[in-house]
Amino acid sequence: MYKQMSIRVNHFESLRQRFPVFEDLRAHLESEGGVSWIPSDDTKGVLAMSRGKSLNNEMFRSVVWNTETNLPLCVAPFKAKEGLPPLGTQMSATENFVDGFIINAWVGSDEVLHVATRKKIGGTNKFYSEKTFGDLFAECLASTQLKTLDGLKDVLNALRIEQSATSAFVSFVAQHPEHRIVARTTSPGLNVVHVGTVTDTGYMTISERSTNWPQAFARLQIPSYPTRIFHSDQEVHDLLRRTSVEKGWRWQGLVFKDGHGSRWRLRTPTYTMMRELRGAEALPMDRFFRLRANHQVMDYLKHYWEDRDAFWGYEHALRNKAADVFSAYIDVHKAHAVAFKDLPDALKPAVFMLHVHWRDQLRTKGFKVRLQNVNQVMNSMRNFEKQRLMEAAPYTQVSKREVGDLPSPIAEIPETV
């Protein structure tokens, strides 16, 4: 193990020598800014450390630290750079870009398996799925020859003992049908990104090459390509284009590793477009609000048709509320039959913004407020305001004035599903 192409990291060892007590180390890192600390729910004396933008050290992207021994336990893959790799430089690997979620696992001297995402030790957080990342990971693990968390623990503990290390860790990229990002996944799966160990001084060794891993991990290596040195940008783009044609639009791109922890990620144009449509929202309602405001709902549903029923439900609710906002606006600002303060709270932001829009944009042109103006205003509202509006009780118009200005809600709203 670790005979060649390993990353030897003494940065944590040096930090520990400078700051033998964890609280001093913590104060130092916080003085540099950009570090967030995430306590473990079930493991005493363990914190996850996440690097912010102001801390200029890629190794601190996500580190799990034992506060009692003042030692690192596990380090996630360093943050990848976007774009082309250095030219004329021998890469350690040219691999497929595998889209999924990163989850890390380690075994320390307690011989207990622990897992962590970047945000939560134990993997108890969620995103797209109602299941936790820890639960999704267990299902992905079951699809491999490791089978169970106990099987993973045995492999890591054997590695720890073999290397006389205080901890042994592995980073996976997991793919699960319930956590779709771009490509649709039909069954759970795992790939190993790197494997590492930590000594009792904090010295760390990380290997990105499957030839250095325990056999159970080597079976989970990410598919790679023989070309590992590029002499021109065109060579890189040619490989990307050829492979994209061969593998189809669901193929996502390439990752280039230099063997020292740095990675470069080059995505296909199709992947980039679909990733932008998918966005960073965990909840489908928040995603719908963004897409609707940008008139991209139909583009999105061409690829993510599984959200069709939910999106249509949101659209129908918003259309109904557009009619309610229009009616409330007439009652307050046209018929003066209702005081603004007496409107339901959920309607007030939209009615207020609609009046401002009329005052600043429409009045000087002699235009009346129409339902398309309501739609425009609603799209510009904050997401929590839209959600509160959608959940509000129906509004009954008090006055009968200017009812003729209210066309069919369905016909007037341009963003259809």
Language-model segments: residues:
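Core nucleotide-handling region used for phosphoryl-transfer chemistry
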Residues: 2-417
